[in-house]
A protein has these predicted regions:
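Solvent-exposed soluble domains appended to multi-pass membrane proteins
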Residues: 1-164
Length: 164
């Protein structure tokens, strides 16, 4: 049933794009697709697996200059700055958002789930279980690098929330 639901959703999205391409608005449009990383598929992947958070961001539409694949790390909150930058609009008020298409931006992904956080860069992937106080995943050529960075980032998030 789950795979049928995925296939049906995919077919609906494809139909939508195919039909939209026929409209005059297509040439000035960008459609953004971001799948839900908690869709629990494949079934063996849990909240403490880095694979659960490797999700694509797809931008399609007539306003997209050329088809290409850009392999960078980012988080859902980076979508705001990325889209606004493409429209040449300011995004300073989104303090935790970065333009994923800007080569000068730091390319990392940060995610949280209840009692854990993760930080992923090209050279280190770490997941820390806050409740147990243990590192669950520490992979890559720079093992240990992202743990203090992730803790600092999480504290910065908490500080920002406390100010609001």
């Amino acid at each position: 049933d789950r795979l049928n639901a995925f296939a049906y959703t995919d077919s609906c999205a494809g139909d939508f794009v195919r039909q939209f391409r026929e409209l005059p608005q297509w040439k000035n449009t960008v459609i953004v697709f971001v799948p839900d990383h908690l869709g629990a598929y494949p079934e063996h992947i849990d909240n403490l697996s880095v694979e659960r958070y490797r999700i694509p961001l797809l931008m399609v539409g007539g306003a997209v200059r050329e088809p290409r694949r850009i392999d960078v790390y980012g988080s859902q909150h980076d979508i705001a700055a990325t889209l606004l930058a493409q429209l040449a609009l300011p995004h300073d008020e989104f303090v935790f958002s970065k333009d994923m298409l800007n080569p000068a931006s730091p390319h990392f992904a940060f995610f949280t789930v209840p009692d854990a956080f993760g930080m992923v860069t090209a050279d280190n992937q770490v997941i820390f279980n806050c409740q147990a106080g243990t590192v669950v995943v520490d992979e890559g050529t720079a093992k240990g690098k992202n743990l203090p960075l992730g803790k600092a980032y999480l504290q910065k998030l908490y500080d920002d929330i406390a100010k609001r």
